[in-house]
Amino acid sequence: MPLYEHVFLARQDASTQQVEELTTQMTGIVEGLGGKVTKTENWGVRSLTYRMNKNRKAHFVLLNIDAPSAAIAEIERQERISEDVIRYLSVRVDELEEGPSAMMRKADRDRERDDRGGGFRGERDGGGFRGDRGDRGDRGPRRPRDEETADEE
């Protein structure tokens, strides 16, 4: 059977439970038509690049599907009918990605960065006079200041 990656965006004001119900409904459709969902990832609420149907944010969900094309057609038909789904995209792939997707790896990496305790670095030295920094090698010698212009001011 063909392999698909299917991503859908649900409205921001839909609860997490409603998004999980949508995901369960899509999984049920696939399994009812002889396929299987090998991986489900909920990427959470993320900002959209541009407004879609008056929404600035959406719940992102990824499904890795091993199913006939009729199952994908039925999923897309149901998502067109559903008011909670803003957009969807199904892509046929040669092989499904094992382990977490790129979005989940990014989320894990961001979480690790937060755990490092960065942020406030305490009091810093410096910020005042740094002394003579020497000549700039990329410029010629400085021209002398005019004594006359300094006296006039």
UniProtKB/Swiss-Prot annotation:
Pfam families for this protein: Ribosomal_S6
Residue segments, region Disordered: 97-153
Biased composition (Basic and acidic residues): 105-147
Molecular functions per Gene Ontology: small ribosomal subunit rRNA binding; structural constituent of ribosome
Any single Gene Ontology cellular-component annotation: cytosolic small ribosomal subunit
The entry's keywords: Ribonucleoprotein, Ribosomal protein, RNA-binding, rRNA-binding
Gene Ontology terms: biological process: translation
Recorded family membership: Belongs to the bacterial ribosomal protein bS6 family.
HAMAP family assigned to the protein according to its UniProt record, in alphabetical order: Ribosomal_bS6 (MF_00360)
Function: Binds together with bS18 to 16S ribosomal RNA.
The name this protein goes by in its record: Small ribosomal subunit protein bS6
Organism: Bradyrhizobium sp. (strain BTAi1 / ATCC BAA-1182)
Lineage per the UniProt record: Bacteria, Pseudomonadati, Pseudomonadota, Alphaproteobacteria, Hyphomicrobiales
Gene name in the database record: rpsF
